[in-house]
Amino acid sequence: MSYQQQQCKQPCQPPPVCPTPKCPEPCPPPKCPEPCPSPKCPQPCPPQQCQQKYPPVTPSPPCQPKCPPKSK
């Protein structure tokens, strides 16, 4: 084996070291869904017409003279 042949034989090189795989970005935190819109209050019931608690007051009949007028 000549000196030149020995020179040519490169010692085995270790395979190139693969760079450590870069950690993938962590998943972004899930975005909170918009909170449910607060249910819109239905329009309040229109106020009920006041129920007359008492029957409407009938005007009292005009005063009648108790005594019939004296016939002259």
Curated annotation (Swiss-Prot):
<feature type="region of interest" description="Disordered">
    <location>
        <begin position="1"/>
        <end position="20"/>
    </location>
</feature>
<feature type="compositionally biased region" description="Pro residues">
    <location>
        <begin position="56"/>
        <end position="72"/>
    </location>
</feature>
<feature type="compositionally biased region" description="Pro residues">
    <location>
        <begin position="33"/>
        <end position="47"/>
    </location>
</feature>
<comment type="function">
    <text>Cross-linked envelope protein of keratinocytes. It is a keratinocyte protein that first appears in the cell cytosol, but ultimately becomes cross-linked to membrane proteins by transglutaminase. All that results in the formation of an insoluble envelope beneath the plasma membrane.</text>
</comment>
<dbReference type="GO" id="GO:0031424">
    <property type="term" value="P:keratinization"/>
</dbReference>
<dbReference type="GO" id="GO:0001533">
    <property type="term" value="C:cornified envelope"/>
</dbReference>
<feature type="repeat" description="1">
    <location>
        <begin position="21"/>
        <end position="29"/>
    </location>
</feature>
<protein>
    <recommendedName>
        <fullName>Small proline-rich protein 2D</fullName>
    </recommendedName>
</protein>
<dbReference type="GO" id="GO:0005829">
    <property type="term" value="C:cytosol"/>
</dbReference>
<dbReference type="GO" id="GO:0005737">
    <property type="term" value="C:cytoplasm"/>
</dbReference>
<feature type="compositionally biased region" description="Low complexity">
    <location>
        <begin position="1"/>
        <end position="11"/>
    </location>
</feature>
<dbReference type="InterPro" id="IPR029142">
    <property type="entry name" value="SPRR2"/>
</dbReference>
<keyword id="KW-0417">Keratinization</keyword>
<feature type="repeat" description="3">
    <location>
        <begin position="39"/>
        <end position="47"/>
    </location>
</feature>
<feature type="region of interest" description="3 X 9 AA tandem repeats of P-K-C-P-[EQ]-P-C-P-[PS]">
    <location>
        <begin position="21"/>
        <end position="47"/>
    </location>
</feature>
<feature type="repeat" description="2">
    <location>
        <begin position="30"/>
        <end position="38"/>
    </location>
</feature>
<comment type="similarity">
    <text>Belongs to the cornifin (SPRR) family.</text>
</comment>
<keyword id="KW-0963">Cytoplasm</keyword>
<feature type="region of interest" description="Disordered">
    <location>
        <begin position="33"/>
        <end position="72"/>
    </location>
</feature>
<dbReference type="GO" id="GO:0008544">
    <property type="term" value="P:epidermis development"/>
</dbReference>
<dbReference type="Pfam" id="PF14820">
    <property type="entry name" value="SPRR2"/>
</dbReference>
<keyword id="KW-0677">Repeat</keyword>
